[in-house]
Design a protein with these regions (language model features):
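Extracellular, repeat-based ectodomains that mediate carbohydrate processing or recognition
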Residues: 1-233
Length: 233
């Protein structure tokens, strides 16, 4: 976990790459891992990751931006602490300067919830995180299973994630927010097969709100990639 985050860009369609620049701005040999990268509609790059620079039992969630297409990186910003150590972060953007970061946060009693923090100023600052599904999943280790997000043209934010909830049954859920990440709808379970293990969901959302969610579905003797589609937001 002792890593440094670096970013390299190509200006010739991927034929060559320029020398990399450091993303994390602390000098310590410490965890900077499970990163995510997103480009918004105006060309800003948004990066999120799990960062152990404070030396606490649980690391924090950090973000940074590039305002010049990857040539330089802004000062790092701590969004929150108490982050699950190995569930990858996710970052995306929406209309009117909205930026969203998702991760799995550890609450008292080893309750692990998927949360989203929002920025209303293109990622300069972030508000306190909001719990998405209220799963109340107690798990005394890191599940290694991240969330995934997407936003449609009207600004609806969609989140998909894995949890085992209070019944300890593996499941993939989706929820959405129509108030720019202040609150979330009731969650909806996506996987319907019995005696399988749904894993690592990913979502893609087009501007009109057509949604595709894919995940791995493991059975005792095989592993499939399963897809769920919505055409009506």
């Amino acid at each position: 976990f002792a890593t440094e985050l670096r970013l390299s860009r190509s200006t010739d369609g991927g034929k060559t790459f320029q020398p990399s620049v450091a993303v994390n701005d602390d000098p310590g040999v410490i965890q900077h891992t499970f990163d995510a990268l997103h480009r918004d509609a105006d060309g800003r790059l948004h990066l999120s990751w799990i960062d152990g620079r404070e030396g606490k039992k649980e690391p924090g969630t950090y973000v940074a931006r590039s305002l010049d297409r990857g040539a330089t990186i802004t000062k790092n910003l701590k969004v929150d602490e108490g982050t699950c150590v190995c569930c990858r972060t996710a970052v995306t953007s929406g209309p009117e300067g909205m930026v969203y970061v998702a991760w799995r946060k550890i609450f008292e009693g080893n309750v692990r919830e998927t949360v989203v923090a929002r920025s209303t100023d293109h990622g300069e600052t972030f508000e306190a995180p909001v719990i998405v599904g209220h799963d109340r999943w107690v798990f005394p280790a890191c599940p290694h299973r991240p969330a995934s997000m997407g936003v449609d043209r009207q600004g609806r934010l969609y989140v998909v994630w894995y949890t085992e909830g209070t019944d300890e049954i593996p499941a993939v859920y989706i929820a959405y927010s129509d108030d720019r990440g202040k609150s979330f709808s009731e969650k909806r379970k996506l996987n319907v097969s019995k005696n399988t293990f749904p894993d690592h969901p990913q979502i893609a959302v087009d501007p009109e709100g057509r949604i595709v969610v894919v995940w791995e579905e493991q059975a005792p003797v095989k592993r499939d990639v399963v897809m769920s589609v919505s055409m009506d937001r």
